[in-house]
Amino acid sequence: MNPRLRSAMQAARSANMPKDNIERAIDKSSIINQSNFENLRYEGFGPEKVAFIVETLTDNKNRTASNIRTIFQKSGGSLGTQGSASHNFSQLGVIKIDKNEISDEDILELAIDAGANECNSYKEFHEIQCSINDIYNVKKELEKKISNFISTSIEWIPLNSVEISDKKKEELINFFETLEEDDDVQNIYSNVKFSN
C-alpha cells in the first residue's frame, strides 16, 4: 500500500469514518487515477500581503487556474508564479497525536529519540515535525509506543508569520472560505497569525 493511501486511511479511521465510506473513497480514487487528474500548486499573496500556497487536484487546469486567479484578484491579492510564496515556507512531515495518548514531557522525549526536528503540544493534540524524507521512519519509531495517531501528512509550514489585526481578520477568513468552496482545492497554507 502506498504511503499516502496508508496515511489517508489512518486519518479516516482516527476520525471514526465508517468502513463503507473509506472503501467508497478508495474506489473513487482508483477512478481518479484512471482519469487525467493533476495535482497543481498555486502560490500568491492574499489580503494584507499574506503568503498563500493552494494545492489542487483537477481534471481541467485552465478552469482551476482561472478560478484561483479570480479568487485572489477579488480579494485584492495576486496570484504569483511557482516560488513566489513558497520561499516563506518549509515543507515538512507533520504527525499529529491525540493529547490523551501521552504526556507533554514523554512525547517530547519520544519525538527526539525518533529523529523529529520539533515537537509542540497544543490543547487537543501533539504535533511532531520532521524532514519529509524521515516522516515514515519517525512514525515507525513512534508506533512502538503510540497507537492513536490523528494524522500523518506533508505540509507547508510558515518560516515567519504575518500578524493581522482583528479588523482585517474577517477579510482573510472570507478569503479562506472562498478558496475552500472551490471543488478543486485540496489544501490551503498561509503564514497568517491573528493578533489577540
Regions found by a protein language model. Give the residues of each.
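Helix N-cap / loop-to-helix initiation motif
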Residues: 16-21, 61-64, 103
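RNA pseudouridine synthases
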Residues: 43-57, 62-90
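Flexible hinge/switch segments at interdomain interfaces of large molecular machines
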Residues: 1-4, 39-47, 79-89, 147-159
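Structural signal for hydrophobic packing residues in well-ordered secondary-structure cores
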Residues: 9, 13, 26-30, 72, ...
